[in-house]
Amino acid sequence: IIGGDECNINEHRFLVALYDVWSGSFLCGGTLINQEWVLTAAHCNMSNIYIYLGMHNQSVQFDDEERRYPKEKYLFRCSKNFTKWDKDIMLIRLNKPVRNSEHIAPLSLPSSPPIVGSVCRVMGWGTITSPNETLPDVPRCVNINLFNYTVCRGVFPRLPERSRILCAGVLEGGIDTCKRDSGGPLICNGQFQGIVSWGPKRCAQPRKPALYSKVFDHLDWIQSIIAGNKTVNCP
């Protein structure tokens, strides 16, 4: 997160961290949506990851911190009417459910679609400088604005005319999600509306917002898989 502050210890109980098993390096964020499922970005998918829940400072362990492995992973595989931009979403089933605790609690799925003009909260352990990386020990939080999708199309002409993508940032620059914030939540008016997906190589430039996968448009898929319907039809 560029331009943010350390998150309040109580405001990110649903925020999880994905690590590479072999190198131990921090990869991505994710969001706990119930006791055994995490929603993240598809581009965070590595063959061997483990997931930390209930973490704040990466070098100080809480008593209720939990470590899990993916038992199952689901990628959004629809090709008709979808471009590669529309598919940066992944569901992970934990190898063992987690219990709610002081630092762990799920974030519910959105009950209504996001509204352009909303102020949204983003958070993560991603780099705090760009283009060179500086990774913080604690998650950073900051507020950004939800723009009309056409704003991002103006910046990234390759984007399709219509898509399941949200466009958000701060037009003056200086505030943004960045590398390794991927997979974390975009929370607008208290609702979980987006997943950190993609942005320019250099983060937080003026008039260059970033892209977020739109959770609301994938609800059918998410709910079907959680319900046990593993061969979900495309919407």
Swiss-Prot record:
The active site is at H43, D88, S182. Expressed by the venom gland. It is found in: Secreted. Disulfide bonds join C7-C141, C28-C44, C78-C234, C120-C188, C152-C167, C178-C203. Not inhibited by hirudin. PROSITE patterns: TRYPSIN_DOM (PS50240), TRYPSIN_HIS (PS00134). SUPFAM superfamilies: Trypsin-like serine proteases (SSF50494). Its EC number is 3.4.21.-. One of its GO terms (molecular function) is serine-type endopeptidase activity. Glycans are attached at N45, N57, N81, N132, N148, N229. Residues 1-227 form the Peptidase S1 domain. Coiled coil: none annotated. Keywords: Blood coagulation cascade activating toxin, Disulfide bond, Glycoprotein, Hemostasis impairing toxin, Hydrolase, Protease, Secreted, Serine protease, Toxin. The keyword Manganese does not apply. Belongs to the peptidase S1 family. Snake venom subfamily. Thrombin-like snake venom serine protease that has coagulant activity by releasing fibrinopeptides A and B from fibrinogen alpha (FGA) and beta (FGB), with a preference for beta chain. This is Thrombin-like enzyme bilineobin. It comes from Agkistrodon bilineatus (Cantil). The lineage of its organism: Eukaryota, Metazoa, Chordata, Craniata, Vertebrata.
